[in-house]
Design a protein with these regions (language model features):
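Bacterial N-terminal signal peptides that target proteins for export
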Residues: 1-10
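Short S/T/G/P-rich N-terminal loop/turn motif that feeds into the first structured element of a domain
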Residues: 14-102, 114-129
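Extracellular juxtamembrane "stalk/stem" segments on the ectodomain side of transmembrane proteins
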Residues: 101-109
């Protein structure tokens, strides 16, 4: 009995220690509809300001942001995607916990004036080697 319990404890410890090595990054993809009067440059400008503010927040220092504009595709009901990548779900959680009332939330309101990004999905992302 002790031998079996010891094996389970060792296996559990190894899994706990190995988990961070195999954990993926947190990726939030927003599907956005751009207002007809807004330009891609305006979207980029506000997204850049938002990312700068977000990087100053707890959990946001290593956030990466991407704008994806289609070249040749049937995108359905969205004009572009705003992609945010955090190095871990722990960092993403700290960032979202601090979001309410933050400078990034204030800039988010400016973004709402030129685009509607109400649909999103959270992904776990792994780099393929």
């Amino acid at each position: 009995m002790l031998n079996t319990a010891t094996r389970w404890m060792i296996a559990s410890t190894l899994m706990i220690l190995a988990a961070p090595a195999y954990s993926g990054s947190a990726m939030q993809i927003y599907r956005c509809e751009q207002d007809d009067s807004a330009t891609d440059e305006q979207v980029d400008e506000i997204a850049s300001a938002w990312l700068k503010a977000a990087r100053g927040m707890k959990g946001g220092a290593e956030l990466e942001g991407y704008l994806r504009f289609p070249i040749a595709a049937n995108t359905g009901e969205h004009d572009f995607a705003f992609v945010l990548v955090a190095p871990s779900f722990e960092a993403w959680g700290a960032f979202t916990d601090a979001y309410s009332g933050s400078p990034a939330e204030e800039i988010d309101e400016k973004f709402d004036e030129i685009a509607d990004c109400t649909r999103s999905a959270m992904w776990e992302s792994f780099k393929v080697e």
